[in-house]
């Protein structure tokens, strides 16, 4: 069967043939992969910035944003059946008995760093025709979300952040009314999203859905499909080409929440200065190797203390976040069908996957499909 693999030692990315996997344990399922989303992590792995093959292997099959169809189940699997659509989770727990998070099924909060991640660290990914995995890591997706369900995994980043926000926002007046659900926690608050890529735009949809007044700050200028999506969901778009970070507060007013989705350290620090009193700053992007920057850490820390600010780093996602992403994606598709569809580029067949991954992006979210013509 076909797969896209990275060979770190020889610095190659290529389409390979490998044996089709078989079920060996009663709690496993076999999944035919349908769509694989390509993100910045995949591109960085293909540029050999990181990525770790499984033990004993000289290559890593990439791909972690995935949608598949169950084709076979083990004897002990009762909650899934052939024909079901599933989105798999990415991270697998470490083996340390003392890691409370992994033992509780929350490996997204692993305390040891010895987790594995499909397609990223120590385990092959999903950019291959078939996968066998434990059924517990499969999230059931309704068939009517078939065309957009590959967006579930990138949406989980925002869902995890939003779930944590609900507790953090209770720490300060005006406290959230206990009668107000987590899905309405943004009412009366202003959010700024940094970046108009898939994670940023999906995060903006989640914030709009939670009733935040939402601004998106990125480098694109009109005409651009990202700006069209921002406007379609009722967010206000601001371009960094015409509005420097130093003027954000004057333009927007007090910023209650910053949702960072760019992985650019200088921009992140510049925008931190614009965070309002009692504000929360959520970091989701992972900065790559960048040139050294000048900063005044004393001033930043002083402002954080004097303004009661919180900076939160968040990575990966747990079972709750996948469930929330599936539910919210259905809501987004109902509220903004055109905007959700606009996130998806034309699907690329597996035979052209390497060229697509190594080349310029096509649309907002590149998708490799095993069913593309």
Where do the language-model regions lie?
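Adenosine-nucleotide cofactor-binding segment
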Residues: 175-179, 183-196, 208-270
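C-terminal hydrophobic helical "lid"/dimerization subdomain
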Residues: 1, 269-272, 318-373
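Hydrophobic/small residue at the entry helix of a nucleotide-binding pocket
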Residues: 157, 199, 222
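Glycine-rich phosphate-binding loop and adjacent beta-alpha segment
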Residues: 265-331, 370-373
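Glycine-rich beta-strand-centered segment in the early N-terminal region that forms part
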Residues: 21-36, 51-100, 142-144
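Residue-level "contact hotspot" at macromolecular interaction interfaces
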Residues: 22-23, 59, 79, 151-154, ...
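NAD(P)H dinucleotide-binding glycine-rich loop of Rossmann-like/cofactor-binding domains
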Residues: 95-190
């Amino acid at each position: 069967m076909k797969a896209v693999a990275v060979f770190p030692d020889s610095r190659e990315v290529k389409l390979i043939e490998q044996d089709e996997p078989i079920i060996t344990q009663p709690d496993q399922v076999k999944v035919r992969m349908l769509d694989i989303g390509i993100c910045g992590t995949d591109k960085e792995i293909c540029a050999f910035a990181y990525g770790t093959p499984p033990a004993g292997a000289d290559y890593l099959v990439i791909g972690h944003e995935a949608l598949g169809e169950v084709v076979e189940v083990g004897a002990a699997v009762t909650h899934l059946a052939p024909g079901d659509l599933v989105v798999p989770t990415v991270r697998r727990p470490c083996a340390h008995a003392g890691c409370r998070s992994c033992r509780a099924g929350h490996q997204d909060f692993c305390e040891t760093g010895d987790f594995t991640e499909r397609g990223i660290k120590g385990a092959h990914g999903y950019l291959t025709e078939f996968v066998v995995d434990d059924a517990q890591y499969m999230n059931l997706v309704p068939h009517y979300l078939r065309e957009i369900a590959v967006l579930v995994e990138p949406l989980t980043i925002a869902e995890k952040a939003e779930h944590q926000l609900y507790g953090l926002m209770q720490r300060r007046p005006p406290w959230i009314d206990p009668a107000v659900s987590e899905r309405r926690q943004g009412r009366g608050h202003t959010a700024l999203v940094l970046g108009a890529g898939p994670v940023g735009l999906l995060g903006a949809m989640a914030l709009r859905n939670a009733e935040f007044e939402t601004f998106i700050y990125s480098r694109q200028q009109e005409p651009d499909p990202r700006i069209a999506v921002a406007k379609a969901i009722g967010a206000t778009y601001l371009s960094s080409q015409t509005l420097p970070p130093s003027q954000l507060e004057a333009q927007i007013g007090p910023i209650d929440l910053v949702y960072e989705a760019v992985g650019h350290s200088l921009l992140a620090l510049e925008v931190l200065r614009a965070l309002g009193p009692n504000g929360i700053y959520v970091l989701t992007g992972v900065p790559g190797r960048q040139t050294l920057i000048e900063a005044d850490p004393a001033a930043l820390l002083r402002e954080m203390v004097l303004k009661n600010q919180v900076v939160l780093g968040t990575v990966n996602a747990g079972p709750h976040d996948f469930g929330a992403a599936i539910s919210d994606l259905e809501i987004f598709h109902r509220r903004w069908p055109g905007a959700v569809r606009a996130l998806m580029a034309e699907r690329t067949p597996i035979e052209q996957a390497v060229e697509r991954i190594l080349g310029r992006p096509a649309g907002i979210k590149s998708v490799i499909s095993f069913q593309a013509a």
